[in-house]
Amino acid sequence: MYQSLMTVRETQIAIKEVKTFFEDQLAKRLELFRVSAPLFVTKKSGLNDHLNGVERPIEFDMLHSGEELEIVHSLAKWKRFALHEYGYEAGEGLYTNMNAIRRDEELDATHSIYVDQWDWEKIVQKEWRTVDYLQKTVLTIYGIFKDLEDHLFEKYPFLGKYLPEEIVFVTSQELEDKYPELTPKDREHAIAKEHGAVFIIGIGDALRSGEKHDGRAADYDDWKLNGDILFWHPVLQSSFELSSMGIRVDSKSLDEQLTKTGEDYKREYDFHKGILEDVLPLTIGGGIGQSRMCMYFLRKAHIGEVQSSVWPDDLREACKKENIHLF
């Protein structure tokens, strides 16, 4: 039976260690400045992240003006707008301590309706919009993960070290070609188990089979220049996503992707006009799950062991029977 390597109190102390180390290194190595983040945005702005395009945001109206607001799913689009508003230049970027509510999330060991992540965004020049630049950025972030594991090992040697020396890059099409008989999720399990750490490139568009590896909203990532960082989780014995990131859409790719998804109405939103008219800067960015990080590096079996959220009674009981104590 599962046995946590730390008490609840020890876990809380270690969570701070994980978050503080990673935040400091992320800011330093990607040259990012921390900014204040909104909990909600106006509906008409189009700044909310609509994830896979089907999840419902929490909506409410403001007494003073009656304006409709949405609690954020993530700050994928807001960050790009903020870079423009704050006058950042190519090579400069920002990050936020993002908190969100995703009401339609299917709850399991790795998913909660409460989301906390380091949301970051950086301005790039047109010639930087390449797979090579994407991979270079992934390698920088992976280097932070490696150093974090080493740092924790010095303080908590019983946590062990599992990350390989290098992260492997693979496209979603190469995965389909390698494992045509498997579902996309099972392909992720197979490749993560084989290599320990992988970055899957190109998520959102249809593969040669006609199926997508996974859904992505049409209006933030360029589907050819994005991807997910996956590790093999030693406790769960499955693939484990730490980050979704990518080079963002330019006017050409946004035009193409909105047409593919049948979302031409979004062209009227302020954010989308800003991209289509080349007003907003070209960027790269992503979200790095804070609870996911803590869950992986502290070797936890459930995300509820590293964050406070709401769980159904039957799920709490099931966890208790497996010796999993949720916050």
From Swiss-Prot:
Protein family according to the UniProt entry: Belongs to the class-II aminoacyl-tRNA synthetase family. AsnA subfamily.
Protein's name in the database: Aspartate--ammonia ligase
Species of the source: Bacillus cereus (strain AH187)
Annotated catalysed reactions: L-aspartate + NH4(+) + ATP = L-asparagine + AMP + diphosphate + H(+)
SUPFAM superfamilies assigned to the protein according to its UniProt record, in alphabetical order: Class II aaRS and biotin synthetases
Keyword set includes Nucleotide-binding: yes
Gene: asnA
InterPro entries associated with the record: aa-tRNA-synth_II, aa-tRNA-synth_II/BPL/LPL, AsnA
Enzyme Commission number(s) of this protein: 6.3.1.1
Biological or metabolic pathway of the protein: Amino-acid biosynthesis; L-asparagine biosynthesis; L-asparagine from L-aspartate (ammonia route): step 1/1
